[in-house]
């Protein structure tokens, strides 16, 4: 099932590569590119490195049609599937395999040194990733194999909790909380809140309003002196229950004013700057 979920990814593509038929290795000193016919390559085409799972594939394909010429599966690098030559960094020896399991060793070379560097680094990065994945899988297996710590309560096991300094009185009962509609407790108003007093209605009389007393009219309406006397006289202050004044005293006061006015000879009215109210 895991093999079916694996997909093939492309690691490197080089458009120009040469293939050489190499002679058998005579000793363990390694391959040498100088022993090959470098000026007469046996095949030229395109190189493509792909990966599927942990295995990398070096594919030699035709430049135009993309037809597969040879394929070299690589399970480990560096290893027997890909080897470097002793006298150059642009040439390698790879082991190709067909569908029947037969294998052969051929030499490949790049005209550009940068292409050879990319070929080498692509294989190194892939197998570095494979190594990291292997280590992660081993760690996960070790974690699964360890006995798990059981922190659950056993059957019938109880615990006792001590919460702060809270002590309950003997024989006392807890006070029920006041709850509002729907069983929700009501919170007190916030401190410093202002209480708005509604304004008084129009039907309520204002106690501070005082009706001014009427000004008594004088018998001599045309006389300016009477007007001045009326202005100089203090206004009566209303009380809660004014006592009626004796009639004789009022008549004596007005009699004095009458006597004074009768003793003054009649004179023609003079213009005054006062405005008559």
Swiss-Prot record:
It is found in: Cytoplasmic vesicle, Clathrin-coated vesicle membrane; Cell membrane. The keyword Repeat applies. Residues 187-201, 235-245 have a biased composition (Pro residues). The keyword Transmembrane does not apply. Disulfide bonds: none annotated. InterPro entries: NECAP_PHear, PH-like_dom_sf. GO terms for cellular component: clathrin vesicle coat; clathrin-coated pit; plasma membrane; presynapse. Transmembrane segments: none annotated. The modification Phosphothreonine is found at residue 211. A motif (WXXF motif 1) lies at residues 254-257. Its main location: membrane. Residues 164-277 are annotated as: Disordered. Residues 258-277 have a biased composition (Polar residues). Keywords: Cell membrane, Cytoplasmic vesicle, Endocytosis, Membrane, Phosphoprotein, Protein transport, Repeat, Transport. Residues 222-234 have a biased composition (Low complexity). GO terms for biological process: endocytosis; presynaptic endocytosis; protein transport; vesicle-mediated transport. Expressed predominantly in brain (at protein level). A motif (WXXF motif 2) lies at residues 274-277. The WXXF motifs mediate binding of accessory proteins to the ear-domain of AP-1, GGAs and AP-2 through hydrophobic interactions. Selective binding to the GAE domains of AP-1 or to the alpha-ear domain of AP-2 is tuned by the acidic context surrounding the motif and the properties of the second residue of the motif itself. The WXXF motif 1, which is preceded by an acidic residue and has a glycine in second position mediates specific interaction with AP-1. The WXXF motif 2, which is followed by the C-terminal carboxyl group negative charge, allows specific interaction with AP-2. Belongs to the NECAP family. Interacts with AP1G1 and AP2A1 components of the adapter protein complexes AP-1 and AP-2. Interacts with the GAE domain proteins GGA1, GGA2 and GGA3. Interacts with AP2A2. Involved in endocytosis. This is Adaptin ear-binding coat-associated protein 1. It comes from Rattus norvegicus (Rat). The lineage of its organism: Eukaryota, Metazoa, Chordata, Craniata, Vertebrata.
């Amino acid at each position: 099932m895991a093999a079916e979920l694996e997909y093939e990814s492309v690691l490197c593509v080089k458009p120009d590569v040469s293939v050489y038929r190499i002679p058998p290795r005579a000793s363990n000193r390694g391959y040498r590119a100088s022993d090959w016919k470098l000026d007469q390559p046996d095949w030229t085409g395109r190189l493509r490195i792909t990966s599927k799972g942990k295995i990398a594939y070096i594919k030699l394909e035709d430049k135009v049609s993309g037809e597969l010429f040879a394929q070299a599966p690589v399970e480990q690098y560096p290893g027997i599937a890909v080897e470097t030559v002793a006298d150059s960094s642009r040439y390698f020896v790879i082991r190709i395999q067909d569908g029947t399991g037969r294998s052969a060793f051929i030499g490949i070379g790049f005209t550009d040194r940068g292409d050879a560097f990319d070929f080498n680094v692509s294989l190194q990065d892939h197998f570095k990733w494979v190594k990291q994945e292997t280590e992660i899988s081993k760690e996960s297996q070790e974690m699964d194999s360890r006995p798990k710590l059981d922190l659950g309560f056993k059957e019938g096991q109880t615990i006792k909790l001590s919460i702060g300094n809270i002590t309950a009185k003997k024989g006392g009962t807890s006070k029920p909380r006041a709850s509002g509609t729907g069983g929700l407790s009501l919170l007190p108003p916030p401190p410093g809140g202002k209480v708005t007093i509604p304004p008084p209605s129009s039907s309520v009389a204002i106690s501070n309003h005082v009706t001014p007393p009427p000004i008594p009219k004088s018998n001599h309406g045309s006389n300016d002196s009477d007007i001045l006397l009326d202005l100089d006289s203090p206004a009566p202050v209303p009380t809660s229950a004014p006592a009626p004044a004796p009639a004789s005293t009022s008549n004596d006061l007005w009699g004095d004013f009458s006597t004074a006015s009768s003793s003054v000879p009649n004179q023609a009215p003079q213009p005054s700057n006062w405005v008559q109210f």
